[in-house]
Amino acid sequence: MVMGSHLCSKLQALSSKIKQASVSGKWREVVSGYSEIQRAGVQFNDPFVFPIVFKACAKLSWLFQGRCIQASLLKRGFESFVSVGNSIADFYMKCGDLCSGLREFDCMNSRDSVSWNVIVFGLLDYGFEEEGLWWFSKLRVWGFEPNTSTLVLVIHACRSLWFDGEKIHGYVIRSGFCGISSVQNSILCMYADSDSLSARKLFDEMSERDVISWSVVIRSYVQSKEPVVGLKLFKEMVHEAKTEPDCVTVTSVLKACTVMEDIDVGRSVHGFSIRRGFDLADVFVCNSLIDMYSKGFDVDSAFRVFDETTCRNIVSWNSILAGFVHNQRYDEALEMFHLMVQEAVEVDEVTVVSLLRVCKFFEQPLPCKSIHGVIIRRGYESNEVALSSLIDAYTSCSLVDDAGTVLDSMTYKDVVSCSTMISGLAHAGRSDEAISIFCHMRDTPNAITVISLLNACSVSADLRTSKWAHGIAIRRSLAINDISVGTSIVDAYAKCGAIEMARRTFDQITEKNIISWTVIISAYAINGLPDKALALFDEMKQKGYTPNAVTYLAALSACNHGGLVKKGLMIFKSMVEEDHKPSLQHYSCIVDMLSRAGEIDTAVELIKNLPEDVKAGASAWGAILSGCRNRFKKLIITSEVVAEVLELEPLCSSGYLLASSTFAAEKSWEDVAMMRRLVKERKVRVVAGYSMVREGNLAKRFLAGDKLSQSDSELNDVVQSLHRCMKLDDTAGPIN
C-alpha cells in the first residue's frame, strides 16, 4: 500500500514535470519525462499529458517516437478522447505526414472545431492551397468555425491562388474576425498584391494600425510604381503616427528609393537605418542598400555596405556582383566572383546571369561554355532567364550556332529567349534565320521582339520585309506609341535606301527624343544626302534637343561622306566648346574626312597629337592608309602608316589587304610581296568580302573571288559593267 502511494506520487511529479517543461519549451525533457513513466511499468491515465507529449514530438520532428507513443495509446483506448485524437492528427500534419494526419482525422469518432482547424491548417501550411480551401469549405458546411491562425492561412491561400479576395473579406466581416489585427493585416496583404486602392481603403478604415499594417501598405504603393506615395506614408508613420518601423518597413522604403532612382533620399534612409541599428544587423536591409546604391550608379557606396555587413548571404553577393556589372565595372565584377569562390559561396542562377553579362562584354567564348556546363550540372536548364542570358552571351561571342542549340533545347521558348536569338542572328548578318524564328514564335511579340525583327530587316536591307515588320508594329500599336520601335522602323527603311519612308515614319513619331533625331540624321548621311542631314541637325538644336556624342558622330559622318571638311571641323569645334569630350570614334571620323580630302599630313598630325587618354585605333590609321592609296602619297608616309595598322591589329586581314593595295598603287611590288608573305607567316585568316542580293524570299551572297559566280558569263558581264561605272563620275573623269 505504501509502495502504491509512493508510485502514485512519483507519477504525479513526472506529470507536473512534463507540463512545466512544455511551458518552458523544453521539448526533449517532455519526451524523456514520458519515457520515465513508461519505464515505471504502470498504467498512466492522465489524458491531458498526451497532447503535450505529441506536441513535443511535433516540435522536435520525431516522427518515429510519436508513432510508438500512438501505438501504446491505441491499445489502451485513449484515442477516443477528442483532445488526444486532435493532438495525434496535429503531430502528423506538422511532421509532414499528411496522409497519416488525414487518416487519424477519419478515424476519430467525434470531432470538434480544433479537429477541422488542424487539418485545414496542416494542408495550407505545407502549400496545399486548393486541398486546404476544400477542407475549409467542408468545415463551414459542418457548422464549425476556423480559428485565427487557420483563417490567416486561408486568406494567404486565397492570395496565392488569386481567388476572389472580396468574398473571403466578406466572410471575415460576417464571422466577427475583422477586429483581430493579424486577420486584418492578412486581408491587407491580399489586397496589396493586386489593388493598392483597396488596400489603402482598408488601411484607412482600420481602427488600430501596427507596424505590419504600415509596412504592407507602403510596400503596396512601391510595387504599384507609386514610390512617392510610399515615402509620404513612411514619413506619416514615423512623425505623425509615432509607429516605430522595423526592418521590413525600411526594406520597402529603400526599394522605393531604388524605383525613384533618388540616391539622395536613399542616403537619408540609410542614415535613418543606422540610427535605428538596422544597417548591419539585418541582411534584408543590407541587401536593399547594396541594390539601391548599385542602381543609383554609386557602386562604391554599395561595396562599402557589403564590406561592412556582418550577415551576408547569397543575395548579398549577387547584389554587389550585379552592381558592378550594372555600372560596367566588369573587371571588379570578376574579382568579386573570384572572392566568392575563395569564400566557398555557392553560386545560383542569379550569379550565373551576372557572369554571362561579364562574358558578353569581354566576348570570351570559353568562359561562356564553362558557365553553360555549370547550368547543366546544377540543373538550371529550366531557368528561362539563365538560358536567355546564355543565348545573349553566345551570340555576342559569335557562337550563333551554339546559341541556336540552347534555344532548340528549351521546352518553352519564351518571348525573351526568342527576341535575344533574333537580335543575335541579326547582329551576325543571318537575317533570314532571324525572321524565320520570329515567324515560328508562339508567344505574342513585345516591343523588344519587334525591335530585334526590325534590326534583322536593317541587315537584310530588304524593303518588302521591312514593310512587313512595320505592319506588325502597327497592328501591335507600337509604331507610333513606342518611340524605340518607331526609331527602329526609321533605321530599317534608311538601310533599305527608302529615305522618304524613313522620314515619313519619323514625322509620325509623337514624342521624339535625341535617339530618333540621331537616327534620321544618320539616315540622310548614309544615303548620300549630307546637306539634308546637316539641316536636320540644325533643326534639332533649334527645337531644344541637346546633341549627344552619337548625334555629333552622325553629323560628322554626313560631313565626311559629303566631303564637307570645313563644316565638319566647325561641328567638331562646337562639340568641344559645349563640353562634349570627343571619343576615338569622333577623332577617327575627322581623320577619315581629312584623308578623303587629301589632307594626309594634317590627318597624321592630328593622330600624333591626340589627348593622352585617347589612343588611335586601327580604323583611324586605316583611313589614312586608304587616303595614301587614293592620293599616291610618298612611300615613307605609307610605310609608317602600314606599320601602325599592322601593330594594332596583327591578325586582321583587312590591314594587310589595304596595305597591299596601297603599295600596288605606288608600284612598290616588293612591299606587295612582303604583305602576302606576312599573311602566310602570321597565319592571318583572310575573310572574303561579299555583297548580298535578294532573290525571292532568300538573301544570296556573292563572295569576292567566287569562281562559281565568275563562271556565269551574263552575271560576270553585269559585274564588269558595274565596276566600270564605279570608276567613272558624271564627267567621265577618275574619282579621287
From Swiss-Prot:
Chain intervals for the UniProt region annotation (Type E(+) motif): 697-727
Identification of the protein by name: Pentatricopeptide repeat-containing protein At2g17210
PPR repeat coordinates: 10-44, 46-80, 81-111, 112-146, 147-179, 180-209, 210-240, 246-280, 282-312, 313-347, 348-382, 383-413, 414-444, 446-480, 482-512, 513-547, 548-582, 583-613
UniProt organism field: Arabidopsis thaliana
MF terms (GO), sorted A to Z: RNA binding
Top-level taxon of the source organism: Eukaryota
Similarity comment: Belongs to the PPR family. PCMP-E subfamily.
NCBIfam families: PPR
Keyword Repeat: yes
Keyword hit for Repeat: yes
GO BP, one annotated term: RNA modification
InterPro entries: Pentatricopeptide_rpt (IPR002885), PPR_At4g14850-like_plant (IPR046960), TPR-like_helical_dom_sf (IPR011990)
Keyword entries, A-Z: Repeat
Region (Type E motif): 620-696
